[in-house]
Amino acid sequence: MDSDIQRQWGELAEEVRGHQFRYYVKDAPVISDGQFDELLRRLTALEEQYPELRTPDSPTQLVGGAGFVTEFRSVDHLERMLSLDNAFSSDELTAWDARVRGDIGQEPEYLCELKIDGVALSLVYENGVLVRGATRGDGRSGEDVTLNARTIEDVPERLAKSEKYPIPALLEVRGEVFFRLEDFEALNASLVEESKPPFANPRNSAAGSLRQKNPAITARRRLRMICHGLGRAEGFSPESLHDAYLALGEWGLPVSTHTTKVRGIAKVQERVNYWAEHRHDVEHEIDGVVVKVDTVALQRRLGSTSRAPRWAIAYKYPPEEATTELLDIRVSVGRTGRVTPFAYMTPVKVAGSTVSLATLHNASEVKRKGVLIGDTVVIRKAGDVIPEVLGPVADLRNGNEREFVMPTACPECGTTLAHEKEGDADIRCPNSRSCPAQLRERVFHVAGRGAFDIEALGYEAAIALLAAGVIEDEGDLFGLTADDLLRTDLFKTKSGALSANGARLLDNLDKAKQQPLWRVLVALSIRHVGPTAARALATEFGDLEAIEGASVEQLAAVEGVGATIAAAVVDWFSVDWHRAIVDKWRAAGVRTADERDDSIPRNLEGLSIVVTGSLPGFSRDEAKEAIIARGGKSASSVSKKTAFVVVGDSPGSKYDKAVELGVTILDEDGFRALLADGPPA
């Protein structure tokens, strides 16, 4: 077939799809029905003449808005989306400024921006055309929400041309998605009219609206966006962030009108104080002010830590507080048996959310805070997110209050509670094998995003499977069959057949069997073993059998593990029924070993290597795993014992330390040579 015909079809199909999206999803057509019909007729005629062009996803084969469904597949960011360090006082802000000035040897200009309380979004434009929108995720990869991002009023599908700022070949721009308060209130009013529960606060509703599978719903939610940073760019090298914002505005991207450029920490503090007084005058919620070094060259010199740039900080305002009645103190039992008291309160609105529950951590914390059941208590949302009981308003006591007494028996199974060892603040239910609460929480944990990531296995499903006796514990999950699920009402239809959710659960379980070893380790609910320690163990040992057979000393020697985690791993595998869980999973086909490349040489044995800055060819985890796989130690700080420092973009102070100590410095090419050939003889 002529390539010109294929190109003609591709351009026409893309144009029709664009108009379908504007009509069916955004409800904002830009051409008449007649003009659209003419485009569709031309496309249909072309496919009739060349039938091989007609594909199942062609606009001619889809009805209405069919096909516009957001799947939330994982996509990698071109540059990492870092977080921000926080300052909660003037002293902390001043100390940060002193570190910045000390590192660069001058007083920089700062940009002061409002810290919008929303959800982060990254947009990628290629030659001015929006090709992707993604959530922050873990900073390295996020969820693809491109269709939903296109429905946001502020997000242009094409960048506007500018004589002063040519459109770059590639532009990755970061921003915050949020609700204006009036739009949030209107949304909640409409939900109430439809007898649906309203959202608790604008941030949660923004996050939920951005993650709708049906982008038409997102379009109706009237989300807004403000851009506040750049990722990777090709053909665009601004000297300052201020200049970058001017360019973004010229291209039609939304930038804040409240950003101010100042010099000196005193001027920064003035802006912080001003917005503390006027935070409720803004059309959206804010929870602080972000302060950034404006000059890009100075940003590069300052570099970043593993989680946040050194050239920026978020000044967080004190969280809002409220008083309410403490109706009761109850306890919950977690998956590792920890018994946690929590406050049950008269619902009260704090920082935009309705709060009725708050953790009290342990009995010692209850005593330290001095709260009594029946007290009027002061609560706040730490970071405007987590509800916390600060303490009682003792002057309002009427004599009817009573002390909380920690139960001596598990509220779920009746087993006597105990401290695991002397001096522990927490008490636990030792009936870990059959306590109903621990069983529920462990089964639910197996399905979590940090473990096997089984979407169809929710809390309700975990309860149903255990209640029906379909599973005895989490070890039975991967052996489930359709007949097993039919023993529960949750997974069968009225006619007695397996429901769609049941079929989806079986499919999810089958796919989860191929998850990497570190996820298996997290799913086992070993005390203290989260994703970081699990990755380290999986990288070092490669299979579960080797981890099970390792000594405390061998485990503790793994970087990122240490003695406490090592002892917890050995203790866990010493229990017969724990090992039985692993045996059941292995028998059901769960992969308990990662594929290892024996051809990788152990040519870095005993060498301590530090990686600083970003390497275009390696993620941070990839570089770390490459070092560990060759017997080296991926260290986090530079010392006299460091053999090599690998320097990428924005290296920060580790580079300076390496120069000071005379440590060998490698660029990415040198790092690749080191991995391939080992250190020079």
UniProtKB/Swiss-Prot annotation:
Source organism superkingdom: Bacteria
Record-linked CDD domains: BRCT_DNA_ligase_like, LIGANc
Cellular-component GO terms for this entry: cytosol
Reaction equation(s) it catalyzes: NAD(+) + (deoxyribonucleotide)n-3'-hydroxyl + 5'-phospho-(deoxyribonucleotide)m = (deoxyribonucleotide)n+m + AMP + beta-nicotinamide D-nucleotide
Disulphide connectivity of cysteines: none
Catalytic residues in the record: 115
Sorted UniProt keywords: DNA damage, DNA repair, DNA replication, Ligase, Magnesium, Manganese, Metal-binding, NAD, Zinc
One Pfam family hit: DNA_ligase_OB
Class of the enzyme per the UniProt entry, highest EC level: ligase
Enzyme Commission number: 6.5.1.2
SUPFAM superfamilies per the UniProt record, alphabetical: BRCT domain (SSF52113), DNA ligase/mRNA capping enzyme, catalytic domain (SSF56091), Nucleic acid-binding proteins (SSF50249), RuvA domain 2-like (SSF47781)
Names of the cofactor(s): Mg(2+); Mn(2+)
Gene Ontology molecular function terms on file: DNA ligase (NAD+) activity; metal ion binding
UniProt-listed GO biological process terms: DNA repair; DNA replication
InterPro entries: BRCT_dom, BRCT_dom_sf, DisA/LigA_HHH, DNA_ligase, DNA_ligase_AS, DNA_ligase_CS, DNAligase_adenylation, DNAligase_N
Binding site for NAD(+): 33-37, 83-84, 113, 136, 176, 292, 316
Family: Belongs to the NAD-dependent DNA ligase family. LigA subfamily.
HAMAP family linked to this entry: DNA_ligase_A
Job description of the protein: DNA ligase that catalyzes the formation of phosphodiester linkages between 5'-phosphoryl and 3'-hydroxyl groups in double-stranded DNA using NAD as a coenzyme and as the energy source for the reaction. It is essential for DNA replication and repair of damaged DNA.
Protein name per its UniProtKB record: DNA ligase
Species of provenance: Mycobacteroides abscessus (strain ATCC 19977 / DSM 44196 / CCUG 20993 / CIP 104536 / JCM 13569 / NCTC 13031 / TMC 1543 / L948) (Mycobacterium abscessus)
